[in-house]
Amino acid sequence: MNEFDKRFGDCGRLLAIDKVPQPVEPGWPELCREAFDHAFNGLLLPPGFPMFAEEGAVYELAGGDELVGLLNPALLAAEASKYGLQVYADVELSESLSASGWTDFFIRGVNNGLAGFLIREPGRFAPADWARLVASVRGVRTDTRFLLWTPGSTPAQLMELRGAGFDGTFLSLPWWDERSPWLADEYARLDAVASVIVPVDANDAGEMLDANLPDFEQYMGRRLWTAAIAGNGVLVPQFVLHSRVSDEVKAVNQWLARRRSIKQPLVVLNGLLGPGTVVFRGGDGIVLNPDRLREATLDWRLVQSRLPTDSAVIDQAVSDNVDSLLPQAYCRFSVKALPFIKLKAISTAEKRRLGLGVMNAARIAIEAVRPQVEDGRFAVKTVVGTTLEITANIFMDGHERLGASVLWRAADESDWREVLMTHEGNDRWSASITLVRVGRHQFHIKAWHDRWESYRAAVIKKRDAGMDVAVDIEEGRLMLGDAVRIARRIHPGITSMLEGLIESGDGDLLLADSTAQAMRTIGFRAFETRCQHDYPIMAERRAAVFSTWYELFPRSESSVPGRHGTFVEVRRRLAAIKEMGFDVLYFPPIHPIGRTNRKGRNNSLTAGKDDVGSPYAIGSEDGGHDAVHPQLGTLDDFRQLLHATKEHGLEVALDFAIQCSPDHPWLKQHPNWFNWRPDGTLRYAENPPKRYEDIVNPEFYQDFELKPRASLWRALRDVVLFWIEQGVRIFRVDNPHTKPLPFWEWMLGEIHSRHPDVIFLSEAFTRPAMMYRLGKVGFSQSYTYFTWRNNKAELTSYLEELATAQVANFFRPNFFVNTPDINPYFLQNSGRSGFLIRAALAATLSGSWGMYSGFELCEAAALPGREEYLDSEKYELRQRNWSQSANIIPEITQLNRVRKSTPALWTHMGVRFHPAHDDHVLFFSKSTPQKDSVVLVGICLDPHASRRAWLDFPFWSWGLPDHATVHMEDALSGREFDLQGNSHQVEFTPESPYFIWRVRGLE
């Protein structure tokens, strides 16, 4: 929460006065009463209004001395305060006064009762001058507000104004086309400066608003509610009070007053090709139809899937009743938070299933149920809000008609929800469900012989062929009698209708659709069959599939070379990391480091007295896995860091490394947990070809008996629970493939049953089967072979493998471009261009990607002939100059910005590779399942040379002829252009080795 929010928790609801009424009495009190009645809490005087009553006041736009006495702002402010209103001046800075002169000017305004000022030209003074000016004025009145008119400001200008002391900024809503994603980008930049207020109109917005136009009410209602949802306050022009939307103005202000200020990002949830535009902030959203001619169909499932809020559901009163919007119409909605799903113990009776003999076997077959992992042995992974399609092959003997349904529930619920399946042909049935709670779910499929529909279809064929169906009709009457006996108590209304039909014997009515519907309602299901077991689903929060990781060593964050960094010093880096677009801040182990066999620089076996050692040699006299290294600070310092990261919109990921130094307290407390050699020494850890003399590993099973060491398993689980209690919700797990799979399945199950929102990243650079198995047992994400996939064929085949359904159901990639252990050969000799190439590949191909600090500075110095960093930070402190030349910070920031505004890039799925007539150029598209977001990416894999490559654009996949025209947007520059024809030559250079184009329209 910024300073504006802290001091003024209520939202800014400002009325922009176009002219102060004259005479002041009774005009001004009447205006104040009217503003109060419409729930405003502030009045903005028009530009040029005199701010002082005393003679000789210096204000060039005062409007004449004869008005000074009549328009005394002190009197106006005093009258306004009676109605709970504060008065602001709209100031256009003249060049005749210095910063100190304007300081005196503002102080005099405050002394005359003004609550604050709207500054139109902040560039008149340097940010430091503004900071001093604001501080001086607040020395007179602490709650003085300085609002900054920001429409038209560049990102660089806004960045300079951070910390200058302003309380409010203004979003460029009146200039927005109600489609482009730049509105959310601008909001993020403004919010970093001060709380965001949204003007409903602006004189220079190019709009001629006429309150008498027939569509004015709809237009202004749309604008008012968009402004209210998008910001922490609104600026409303005075003329609206006397228009047909005055009641809507009051409703908006009252809604804002109830909501109060919130510190939440603004997001545009749809792609450029969607029929409508969805703006969402906090728990509220608005759907706009910007088209002036066509209706917009609303896909509430799609909106649900894009919500940035985990475990929440859209208000059913809206989603169940509004399925389209007329041209230029809008629809508001809200979301309701739902509790996470926490498991309860399953009884032995529920687990026990008894098989049936062959003679009693199900007559109906249910096969090839999808999605599933190893026939339900492990949970399918999905993300809350995403629509999950469930399919199966369902059939029985003969040509009988069948029915089928999916039954599903959350693991902490007892009642099942049922969704009827649709027959797609060739015995394939399908249904879709949407999971909106974080946690474990389960589903199964039921199928039955639809006796009535089978009978009805056969008789209709006979009747239409002119055959005698009298006996058949009598058979139908008997079947209806059976149904009546079944349904008499449950469906009395339907029972009465069927009894009348039986009595009449009317064949046409008996075969009618209405009778078939009545029989379906009764549930007249013969040979009902259930699939063999329930299939588990794990619905995780969005960060499990879409996240951006930044790794740093807290001990290297000191501003003094050679001094050990602290958690407090890490906080200084948070703004810069968030500015680059990262949302997960990952720390290697932060625990005490052992002394025995401590490693020296560059993994030397001999450490000097000042060498800091490897953080993976965990444990000393200062504690073990539940302690922090004393030179980093205290546990309370760490909690404060967690709080600060949350304030910056970041999450901390901790390294969970099951590794101990010989000094770890566990060796004395639990010596039986470790592998002691006959000579009394310990066997140190190995991960061939690497050896870790400073680390020993606990043993998960007891010698000879091969029984789990339950006390060790519980202790490791409790370590994770301890850090969860501190506020950590993401863990990167070191080398999980060197620990038993049963342990991981047990421990991850224990954690997720209590805290289903916790995310685990597997750092297992090993064989594919083991990496995939770790995903199956519960890891949310995994490092991948991307680090070593460099050429076109390697990248194409690997992405196609990861995107197959059988892999995607349990394995999610996180593309790290480097790690403290891995300095890829490609980066060692590719220069700045190579870093741009790898960043672009990771950011566009994977929903989650990460980098280890120093990558943005193009660090590549390596140990000769090895894929390791020279002077590795694993063994020493590394202070860096973050502003050094040749960095790629702007490009990384740009890539992350594009990712967040392009839904097609939110996952590794939906990728298709297209012909590029150059083996060094990778060309691909990504699209959402709904095709509302389509992006084309070209990346040159050669970091040393410029290349011109012919690219074949996938017009055929969009149903377009080869000569068609596609309207595009360059996501990096914002430039829009038309692409005519499906083959084009594109140039790539080492300075600009990639492009990202978003499809805006197809012709």
Could you say what each language-model-derived stretch is?
Residues 20, 44-53, 91-95, 120-126, ...:
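Short, solvent-exposed turn/loop segments enriched in Gly/Ser/Thr/Pro and often Arg
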Residues 150-181, 661-672, 744, 752-753, ...:
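Substrate-binding cleft/loops of secretory-pathway carbohydrate-active enzymes
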Residues 1-50, 74, 79, 131-133, ...:
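Carbohydrate-interacting/catalytic domains
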Residues 98-156, 676, 704-771:
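Active-site neighborhood of glycoside hydrolase catalytic domains
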Residues 13-17, 43-45, 87-89, 117, ...:
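Hydrophobic faces of well-ordered beta-strands that scaffold small-molecule active sites
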Residues 8-16, 49-76, 80, 100, ...:
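Aromatic- and acidic-residue-enriched carbohydrate-binding clefts of CAZyme catalytic domains
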Residues 31, 35-47, 65-112, 119, ...:
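Substrate-binding cleft of carbohydrate-active enzyme catalytic domains
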Residues 73, 100, 142-149, 167-177, ...:
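Acidic, His- and aromatic-enriched active-site or binding-groove loops in soluble protein domains
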